[in-house]
């Protein structure tokens, strides 16, 4: 059975259209890796074809919000200096910086999350499920689902893009890879907030960033 999650994963990894991804999954009986090969053969896996190419050019972009209360630096890479200087690429980098300011990700992707952090989250989530009186047989699936939610909230590439919540940041990047014709990656980022780590009256700066987009 081909699920919406499978189609979404294939889209994120290839940048191909939704119907093309669905057809490829049907033709390969739901095998993601074979579906990628199928799309590449047909010339549709634009992002997958470019993912292995070296992206050593790019920009370091900053975003400062609220009179200097939140600051972000992010390095976004592409293959050539020509693309790095385009307005489209600069706008992409700026949008990613705003995303980081608003959504406060802790990691770039799920591969960066330490195993001990994942294990701790699982223990907490399992304890919560037991506290809710859930049957043992459904707890494992519940924990799996909540760990996925954890990744989508804490990992930049899996977060919903603040300007279009129907797509992830990874899908945004894949769209730009397809349009610009070069591999694009986020190498690293840093986010600073005034008074971070100091006990103070709560102030939701992230919501302020989000409100600017409305």
From Swiss-Prot:
<dbReference type="Pfam" id="PF00889">
    <property type="entry name" value="EF_TS"/>
</dbReference>
<dbReference type="InterPro" id="IPR001816">
    <property type="entry name" value="Transl_elong_EFTs/EF1B"/>
</dbReference>
<comment type="function">
    <text>Associates with the EF-Tu.GDP complex and induces the exchange of GDP to GTP. It remains bound to the aminoacyl-tRNA.EF-Tu.GTP complex up to the GTP hydrolysis stage on the ribosome.</text>
</comment>
<feature type="region of interest" description="Involved in Mg(2+) ion dislocation from EF-Tu">
    <location>
        <begin position="80"/>
        <end position="83"/>
    </location>
</feature>
<keyword id="KW-0963">Cytoplasm</keyword>
<protein>
    <recommendedName>
        <fullName>Elongation factor Ts</fullName>
    </recommendedName>
</protein>
<dbReference type="InterPro" id="IPR036402">
    <property type="entry name" value="EF-Ts_dimer_sf"/>
</dbReference>
<comment type="similarity">
    <text>Belongs to the EF-Ts family.</text>
</comment>
<keyword id="KW-0251">Elongation factor</keyword>
<dbReference type="GO" id="GO:0005737">
    <property type="term" value="C:cytoplasm"/>
</dbReference>
<dbReference type="InterPro" id="IPR018101">
    <property type="entry name" value="Transl_elong_Ts_CS"/>
</dbReference>
<keyword id="KW-0648">Protein biosynthesis</keyword>
<dbReference type="InterPro" id="IPR014039">
    <property type="entry name" value="Transl_elong_EFTs/EF1B_dimer"/>
</dbReference>
<dbReference type="InterPro" id="IPR009060">
    <property type="entry name" value="UBA-like_sf"/>
</dbReference>
<dbReference type="GO" id="GO:0003746">
    <property type="term" value="F:translation elongation factor activity"/>
</dbReference>
């Amino acid at each position: 059975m081909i699920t919406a999650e499978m189609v979404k994963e294939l889209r994120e990894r290839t940048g191909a259209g939704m119907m093309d991804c669905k057809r490829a999954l049907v033709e390969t009986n739901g095998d993601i890796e074979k579906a990628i090969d199928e799309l590449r053969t047909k010339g549709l896996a634009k992002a997958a074809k470019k993912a292995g190419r070296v992206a050593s050019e790019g920009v370091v972009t900053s975003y400062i919000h609220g009179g200097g209360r939140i600051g972000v630096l992010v390095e976004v890479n592409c293959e050539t200096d020509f693309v790095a200087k385009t307005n489209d690429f600069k706008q992409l980098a700026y949008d990613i910086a705003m995303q980081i300011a608003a959504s406060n990700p802790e990691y770039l992707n799920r591969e960066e999350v330490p195993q001990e952090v994942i294990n701790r989250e699982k223990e907490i989530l399992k304890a919560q499920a037991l506290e809710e009186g859930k049957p043992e047989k459904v707890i494992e699936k519940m924990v799996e689902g909540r760990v996925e939610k954890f990744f989508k909230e804490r990992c930049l590439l899996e977060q919903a893009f603040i300007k279009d919540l129907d797509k992830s940041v990874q899908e945004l990047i894949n769209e730009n890879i397809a349009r610009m014709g070069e591999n694009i990656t986020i190498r690293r980022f840093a986010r600073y907030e005034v008074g971070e780590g100091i006990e103070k009256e709560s102030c939701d700066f992230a919501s302020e960033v989000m409100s600017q987009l409305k």
